[in-house]
UniProtKB/Swiss-Prot annotation:
The keyword Transmembrane helix applies. The chain crosses the membrane at residues 11-31, 53-73, 93-113, 127-147, 160-180, 189-209, 243-263, 276-296, 314-334, 350-370, 387-407, 418-438. One of its GO terms (biological process) is xenobiotic transmembrane transport. It is a multi-pass membrane protein. PANTHER family: FMN_FAD EXPORTER YEEO-RELATED, MULTIDRUG RESISTANCE PROTEIN NORM-RELATED. HAMAP family: MdtK. Belongs to the multi antimicrobial extrusion (MATE) (TC 2.A.66.1) family. MdtK subfamily. This is Multidrug resistance protein MdtK. Multidrug efflux pump that functions probably as a Na(+)/drug antiporter. Keywords: Antiport, Cell inner membrane, Cell membrane, Ion transport, Membrane, Sodium, Sodium transport, Transmembrane, Transmembrane helix, Transport. It comes from the Bacteria. GO terms for cellular component: plasma membrane. The keyword Cell division does not apply.
Length: 457
């Protein structure tokens, strides 16, 4: 029992800074929305539309680079720290190549925006302008993620938290300058949010690099002088590990976007209630997601040390802590669902629907926690392909079709509206949790030699 308590302390010490970093990132988006809304409703809508396109694109790159964390954790655990710098250099090359592709997609996103039904031309122009300003931040964001993954792979999660809050503090005044045109800068409205956010990502990257160069704990990990050439073998391995994670993230984000589109014809009350419940459950999701990042680090580190039993302990502890957290958040959600809904809106119909949907959200808290921590465990074992297959099957083959049938058809029951989609979420997330656990058990029952061989690839 003592080993589980010790492991839980280590996991929480790693996870809490990740939680705070995620809060800072979420707050940046909130600040952009509020400050753009203070300028005009059109600018706020433009930022919202632009963000809905930016997020799937940048999260694809983010997911691709998540492969670095278990690789570095495993090298650190095995005492092969001299190889870490080379992995990081190749991570920067990969981030550079991916950012070019993302920038090309975002530059041409105007075709998607202008094809939206009945969109106001002025709104479309502002959304395109916002994206074309923001896209210059894509390299900065991805380079920052490489540096952050280096730190997190070495079990240093506090730097990412600190840089997140530095970014938030810089974002507010820079937003003000470019939205309203102060200190000789042009008045750009919502487009100014894109300029500010792009600048902030570069500031965060440069601040993180400055920290890494000065950190005593990383003195033995230094990039060699001059520009290192791309190493096709290392980059291929990073892509093999990272692409399934990237695709899983992409399909997860697009799933919620598709559901939002399917709910939109149902009316203002249904859309508002759905959005409130989804926004709140997304905030609660930060807890297990951050714990999953910590579990990846611990499992990778233990496998690097050559201890499959300690890796199992880290995995089991992560799941136990995650279930405890999810139970508390579910109780919190059920107890205060109406008060929470009132923070967003005071329309009685909207509050009633949102509170009802939050009950369904509370039902899947534990499943959601298990599936996301299970994903973190599999990343630690470098078993990333199964993450994609499980996620795609659970969300797109089981969750979305069942949600659609319940919400919009009378094949099973009378059309349930948004609640049908939320039952679909429960089906999808529970299926994902079961499949993640089955895959984890399969891996852990393999001979230790095979587990360590797979982890050292």
């Amino acid at each position: 029992m003592q080993k589980y308590i010790s492991e839980a302390r280590l996991l929480l010490a790693l996870a809490i800074p990740v939680i705070l970093a995620q809060i800072a990132q979420t707050a940046m988006g909130f600040v952009d929305t509020v400050m753009a809304g203070g300028y005009s409703a059109t600018d706020m809508a433009a930022v919202a539309i632009g963000t809905s396109i930016w997020l799937p694109a940048i999260l694809f790159g983010h997911g691709l680079l998540l492969a670095l964390t278990p690789v570095i954790a495993q090298l650190n655990g095995s005492g092969r720290r001299e190889r870490i710098a080379h992995q990081v250099r190749q991570g920067f090359w990969l981030a550079g190549f991916v950012s070019v592709l993302i920038m090309l997609v975002l530059w041409n996103a105007g075709y998607i925006i202008r094809s939206m039904e009945n969109i106001d031309p002025a709104l479309a122009d502002k959304a395109v302008g916002y994206l074309r300003a923001l896209l210059w931040g894509a390299p900065g964001y991805l380079f920052f993620q490489v540096a952050r993954n280096q730190c997190e792979g070495l079990a240093k999660t506090k730097p990412g938290m600190v840089m997140g809050f530095i970014g938030l503090l810089v974002n507010i005044p820079v937003n003000y300058i470019f939205i309203y045109g102060h200190f000789g800068m042009p008045e750009l409205g919502g487009v100014g949010c894109g300029v500010a956010t792009a600048a902030v990502y570069w500031v965060m990257f440069l601040a993180m690099v400055s920290y890494i160069k000065r950190a005593r704990s990383m003195r033995d990990i230094r990039n060699e002088k001059g520009t290192a050439k791309p190493d096709p073998a290392v980059m291929k391995r990073l892509i093999q590990l990272g692409l399934p994670i990237a695709l899983a993230l992409f399909f997860e984000v697009t799933l919620f976007a598709v559901v939002a589109l399917l709910v939109s014809p149902l009316g203002i009350v249904d859309v508002a209630g759905h959005q409130i419940a989804l926004n709140f459950s997304s905030l609660m999701f930060v807890l297990p997601m951050s714990l999953a990042a910590a579990v990846t680090i611990r499992v990778g580190y233990r496998l690097g040390q050559g201890s499959t039993l300690d890796a199992q302990t880290a995995a089991r502890t992560g799941l136990m802590v995650g279930v405890c957290m999810a139970t508390l958040t579910a109780i919190f959600t059920v107890s205060l669902r109406e008060q929470i809904a009132l923070l967003y809106n005071d329309n009685p119909e909207v509050v009633t629907l949102a509170a009802h949907l939050m009950l369904l959200a509370a039902v899947y808290q534990i499943s959601d926690s298990i599936q996301v921590i299970g994903s973190g465990i599999l990343r630690g074992y470098k078993d990333t392909r199964s993450i994609f297959y499980i996620t795609f099957t659970a969300y797109w083959v089981l969750g979305l079709p069942s949600g659609y049938i319940l919400a919009l058809t009378d094949l099973v029951v009378k059309p349930m509206g948004p609640a049908g989609f939320w039952i679909g979420f429960i089906i999808g997330l529970t299926s994902a949790a079961i499949m993640m656990m089955l895959r984890m058990r399969f891996l852990q029952r393999l001979p230790s030699v095979i587990i360590l061989q797979r982890a050292s690839r």
